[in-house]
Each structure stands twice: as structure tokens, then as C-alpha cells.
Amino acid sequence: MSKLNKKTFFIILLLSSLVSCSTFDSLRFWSNDDDVDPDEPKELLSFNEQRNINIEWDISFNGVNDLGSFKPGFSSENLFFADAEGNLISVQSSTGKENWKKQLNFLSSGVASGFGILVVSDIKGNVIALNQNDGSEIWSTNVKGEVLSTAAIDPKTVVVKTGSGELIGLEKTSGETLWSYRSKLPTLTIRGSSSPVIFDNNVFVTFDNGRLGVFDINSGFLLWDGAISYVSGTSELDNLIDADADPVVDGGLVYTTNYQGKLNIFDIAQKRSVWSYDVSSFFSPVVSRGMIIVSESNSNIKSFSAKSLEESWSNEDYLNRELSNPASFKGNLVFGDFEGYLHVIDPLNGKTIGRKKISKKPIKTLFSRSNSLYAIDEAFNLFSVSI
């Protein structure tokens, strides 16, 4: 099983499209001014500003955040964040003032926080639990595989998923392995991984084979699963259907997306898919204000009525601008892009109502909590933002 990071994957995809062209004229790289390259990032359009964006504080870390998999953890009034070089810090979420910091080995994923502990994973396959108060190590367990996504924590169990598709339950106080499940992976996958989600004593997780699995958290027993989409191409690239987005559990339903696949809604009680729509996405959908909103892999944004499931609006203003994950914040929809902009969109009509450039680097991840929105760029700069 081979892993491609997203940048490498898109380069390969571009090269394969060039090889298929029979003449240089068909490439049209130097054609007249009336021609528009459909793969070029769309220029930003003017808009009617209704929201102001302000940076409350920012902290710079080390390394390259190319996958956007490093997310902050929270507990009470504190924020915990780590970079790829193992710098772990606790700060006051309102001011950014440092509480404590700790140096760890090179890390492969961000910080999970819950029930008095922090959990991180390093590049050697070690899952490490630390005390939230001072960063002291509680336990470390090697799971024999790199963990590329944030762990999930409940009162008794820490759940992690490795890049090789293994889901593992660890005892929260000791790190002892309680159970494991290995999914069947395709030959080629995109380097990235969704995080498990714990809800009502069950673990919901999506895999690189394009399936959703639901497990009992105590035993690791597979309760039910279903395909988000099926392969339909003739080549390995065509058959990439990685589900790198965390499932969203809301109102008895599970919302899932995958690459070159679908937005698929599963009913938990019925244990099956009840609706799907063809999309290609690396990000979890946003379910907010009666809308289901998904950012596609080409940065087109689509929305659906959560009640009727009919398509509502579509926004192509940000095509190929490498949008970050969407975040719902104070009734707004927020995205980052490859030029370091934050964009605020009205989720009811898809219109842009706010914008600000906060970084010289691409914005990779957005995370909202309480009255603050947090943005993380490719250079591991962490911004606390208010709107």
C-alpha cells in the first residue's frame, strides 16, 4: 500500500492529463487573452463587507504543516497545541499567554484533549498520554504504525487510527491495548487520515477504502458499516476514494464525504445509507442553520437543505484556491485559502460577507470553540481570530 501526500497526488494527476494531450496546441498554455485556464486559482471578487475579522493573538511554531492534520486541543480556559517538531505548549485560550511547554519527539498528529489528559502521536508510532496541568508523561504505547490523525478520548478509552488503516482502543489510564481492528486498504491512497469520533459509546470512523465503520468502544466489535461510495474507474488514480474527513454525527444521522465519491448520510437506527450525492471532498461537511455545506476538492462550495436534501446554492468564487476545511462560527461559514486569506460566507445564501489576509502562507486548518476561531497555516503559525 502506497501513500501519496496531497501535493504529490495533484502533480501526478496534472502530469497524467498532460501526457494524454496529443499536441502542444491542445495544452493552450500560451493562447490568447480570451482563454482561461480552468485549473488556475480564481481571482478574488469584490463583495459587500458585513463582517470584520480581527486577530486577537498569534504564536509561531516550527516545521511544515502540509497535511493540515495538527489541530489544537482544549480544556476549560486552556488551549494545547503541538507542531511537527514536538514542541507542545499550553496557553490561555483568551490571551495566548503561556502556561507551560514541553519538548517531545517529532510528531505525526495534533493534540487530543479530554478527561484530564492530552494525547499526541510521534513519527515512530508511539501514542503518548500527558497530564493537562503540566505536560508530564502518564504513559506511552507503541502501536506499530504512524498515527496521522487526532485521537478520540472517552472516560475509559483512547482510540487512535494508524495510517495503515488499523483502529486501536487503548486503556485511558495505562495505555494498554484493549482491542484493534484492521481495515482492508487499496493499493494506493492519499497521505492523510480521518479521526475517529466517539458518540453514545460507539466509535464512528471512515477508512481509506471509502467505508464508514461503527464500533462498540468497549470491545472494538464492528456493529455495522457501509460504503460511502464505490470505485468506478479503470486506473488506481481513478479508484482513489479515500475518506480523509471525520464523520459528523448529528441528530441520529452520520454525515460522511470522500474523495472522488459522495456526500453520504447514514441513519444510525437503520444502520444504512439513506441519501447520497456525488461530490469529491477531503473535508467534513458542516451541518448548521438547517444547511449541509461541503467544500469540494476543487474548492467549489455546495449546500443542501438539511430538511429536504435539495441542493440550495453553489459558490464557484473560490475555485482552485485550495480552501481549508470549512468552519461554522457564530452563524457564519469560514474558509482559509492558499494565499493566507480568511473568507466569511453567509451559509443561507453562499455570499461572501467578510475577508482578511492573516498570513503569507496557506491556511491549512480552521477550528472553532466558544467565542474564538483558530486558524493554522502551513508554517505552523497559530492565530486566534474574532469575527
Regions found by a protein language model. Name each.
Residues 2-9:
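Bacterial N-terminal signal peptides that target proteins for export
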Residues 83-84, 122-123, 162-163, 207-208, ...:
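Structural signature of WD-repeat beta-propellers
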Residues 92-95, 131-134, 171-175, 216-220, ...:
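Short loop/turn segments that connect beta-strands within beta-propeller blades
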Residues 294-302, 310-344:
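Loop/turn-rich, solvent-exposed surfaces of beta-rich toroidal or solenoidal domains
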